[in-house]
Amino acid sequence: MLGRLGLGLLLSIGVAGAAAAQGSARFDGSYMGELVLTKTISGDCAEPPLGSLYPLTIARGDVRFAYRPRFDTELVGRVGDNGNFEASARSRNGLVRMTGHIQGDSITASIVSPSCHYSFQTKN
């Protein structure tokens, strides 16, 4: 009897842990936003073309942001139930990291790389 109780407890902890690791699907969707260069560290940063919009997608709590043209890479991460998210990828110059928050259908975020800092904001 005690063995079954212990096994049941372990299974329920495992299911709860897996659910927490999945991220929040309530923010699923496709978003378009503007990138603005906010800081140049090493001098090889590109100002995004005026009016250019960049896609950020969320599916089953997985965040994906195509970080082009600068590093030609895709940042990947998770969004939490509170709307906070983080996505990252390795580039040839080091780690590129995006942190942000979703409020309704509005997203604000910052992208930090070894050479450049950008802000990202959705345009509705």
Region locations from a protein language model:
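Bacterial N-terminal signal peptides
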Residues: 6-16
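Sec/Tat signal peptide C-region and signal peptidase I cleavage site
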Residues: 17-21
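Positively charged n-region of N-terminal signal peptides that target proteins for export
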Residues: 1-4
